[in-house]
């Protein structure tokens, strides 16, 4: 794959699982339950990329398989987690070599992009990653739920556990999909992925409930009870009434827990379900970063033929991406230098993420100095092509 002298990058052998576990324990603060969950349910040596120096593994990362729904198309991608180096071998450039090898590998596997949740975004920007999705966090007193009523007619709240979960996976998927339909980009969840989410929640000592009204599944909630706080990891419903009804369940814990912290998709405006918005603290944080590996494939996915724009992209890591992309009656690429290229706009590979996912509007990108537009008359046209959009990804591994 990649080797220079005594350095070698490869996927792990079956016998190296213990090494992977040690790396994880040395680098992250996860509990024994969380580590056990990961290595029992998700870890796969075929996705564990390691860098060896003198036959010793000194740096590693995990590439976990996911299917993105990106502009209504199912796309295979990798969620990069557990990026770490041997504590005694840091600052030797191992991590950089490993990340670049991962990007090159993923591109060879025909993946248009990969994604990760950074501990420090500054590190990953150097490799062309940029944010493309936010999460909203709402903090409020449990008493704010006092007016949220239980359903009137025939209803049931069912706690989902290891024994009964298979009965409810399809209904969880239906509620999830109904919430995703307006998102430009989200992770597809089938039975396997929902099962993983429930196991992960359980390893984090969380509970999951689903609300039925009559025979219809209307909402679900995944939450944990910690000290004086109720942490809601995910709460999705078919409509705002069902949303309030599933939150009414949480009010039942009011004698023991004082505050609620609720995570929600971007632009969900949950504060307006409450009577007093000023009592609801809302914090919006960037959550997930993407790295575009193949701009041509993305422009085709976005169906940008006949847009009649020319975009010059600069990629300092995967240099073969640098060049002119012409979105005419067909989408073409030419690796000419910037001096020779005639283009409408210039952008680097990281900021391209903002553009293609609609994280920012064109006007925002101009204000932030993230895009260089040669011809100002084209801004109106660009605003039509690259509109602002929402994405939802709230996975941890």
Predicted regions, residues:
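Short amphipathic alpha-helix that is part of the acyltransferase structural core
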Residues: 3-60, 64-65, 72-79, 146-191, ...
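Conserved active-site alpha-helix within GNAT-family acetyltransferase domains
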Residues: 108-112, 118-136, 267-283
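Intrinsically disordered, low-complexity, positively biased terminal segments
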Residues: 2-5, 18, 156-397
């Amino acid at each position: 794959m990649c080797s220079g002298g005594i350095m070698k990058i490869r996927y792990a052998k079956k016998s190296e699982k213990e090494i992977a576990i040690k790396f994880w324990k040395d680098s992250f603060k996860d509990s024994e339950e969380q580590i056990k969950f990961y290595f029992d349910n998700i870890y796969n040596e075929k996705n564990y990329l390691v860098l060896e120096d003198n036959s010793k593994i000194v740096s590693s990362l995990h590439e976990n398989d996911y299917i993105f729904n990106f502009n209504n198309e199912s796309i295979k991608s990798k969620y990069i987690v557990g990026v770490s180096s041997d504590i005694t071998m840091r600052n030797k450039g191992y991590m950089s070599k490993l990340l670049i090898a991962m990007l090159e590998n993923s591109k060879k596997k025909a993946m248009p992009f990969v994604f990760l949740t950074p501990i420090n975004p500054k590190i990953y920007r150097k490799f062309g990653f940029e944010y493309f999705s936010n999460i909203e966090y709402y903090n409020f007193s449990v008493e704010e739920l006092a007016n949220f009523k239980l359903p009137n007619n025939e209803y049931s709240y069912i706690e989902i556990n290891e024994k009964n979960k298979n009965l409810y996976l399809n209904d969880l998927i239906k509620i999830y999909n109904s919430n995703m339909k307006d998102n430009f980009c989200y992770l597809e969840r089938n039975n396997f992925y929902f099962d993983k989410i429930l196991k992960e929640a359980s390893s984090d000592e969380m509970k999951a409930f689903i609300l039925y009204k009559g025979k219809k599944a209307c909402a679900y909630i995944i939450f944990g009870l910690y000290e004086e706080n109720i942490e809601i990891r995910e709460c999705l419903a078919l409509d705002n009434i069902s949303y309030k009804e599933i939150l009414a369940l949480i009010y039942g814990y009011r004698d023991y827990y004082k505050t609620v912290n609720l995570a929600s998709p971007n632009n969900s405006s949950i504060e307006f379900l409450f009577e007093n918005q000023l009592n609801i603290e809302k914090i919006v944080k960037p959550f997930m970063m993407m790295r575009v590996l193949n701009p041509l494939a993305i422009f085709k996915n976005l169906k940008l033929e006949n847009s009649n724009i020319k975009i010059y992209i600069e990629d300092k890591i995967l240099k073969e991406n640098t060049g002119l992309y012409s979105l005419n009656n067909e989408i073409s690429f030419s690796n000419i230098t910037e001096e020779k290229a005639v283009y409408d706009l210039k952008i680097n590979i990281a900021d391209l993420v903002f553009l293609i996912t609609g994280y920012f509007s064109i006007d925002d990108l101009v204000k932030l100095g993230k895009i260089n537009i040669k011809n100002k008359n084209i801004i109106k046209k660009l605003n039509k092509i690259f509109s602002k959009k929402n994405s939802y990804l709230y996975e941890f591994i």
